Amino acid sequence: MENYELQIRKTRTVPGTRGNIFDRNGEVIAYNELAYSVTIEDIIPTDTKTEDKNKILNDTLDSVLSIVEENGDSVIDNFGIILDSSGSYQFAETNETSRLRFVADVHGKSFIDDLTEKEKNKTAEQIVHYLCKRYGLDYSEHDAAYILKMVNMRYAMGLNSYQQWLTTVLASDVSDATAAAIMENQDSLQGVDISEDSLRRYPDGQYFASIIG
């Protein structure tokens, strides 16, 4: 039987680094600063059972969350659900169309009109329950804040599920301590890595950021 070599081309976009900008007196008005991000690539074999994959991912993300927070940093917080002052789940969007667009995305629907009435009327808490079931997260064993952080990270990873080689940012602009701790524990953090980013800084504030570049 002939041997075949499987060749896979993986394409990633690498942002360019902009140079420093000086004013006419030689003072720096825009510069780059090295920053670290915690990223993850889904390297779990595609034939892994869903239950097993969920456990691997959840254990990994739980460890990442602990490391990040122990060093004073935070994981991503760009999900469509937030916690209100009483600790209850609420939709981040108050605009009804935007809220329904988010609900449609959660349910994998291309159009809002594809949602059933039951799906349209789901509360934020029901959406979280729905995703916990999908991700194999035990809703009853953890507080709302922990669950929301885990759902945040799992949902972000899910957005790249059809392009597994794309990395997902779990925490951005983290401290040197966080970056070092992640690297020290990398053997037990499947697919997790530290990426170097270039953040644009403006000594005189953001007032002219859109003009300076």
Regions found by a protein language model. Give the residues of each.
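Membrane-proximal periplasmic segments of bacterial cell-envelope enzymes
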Residues: M1-G213
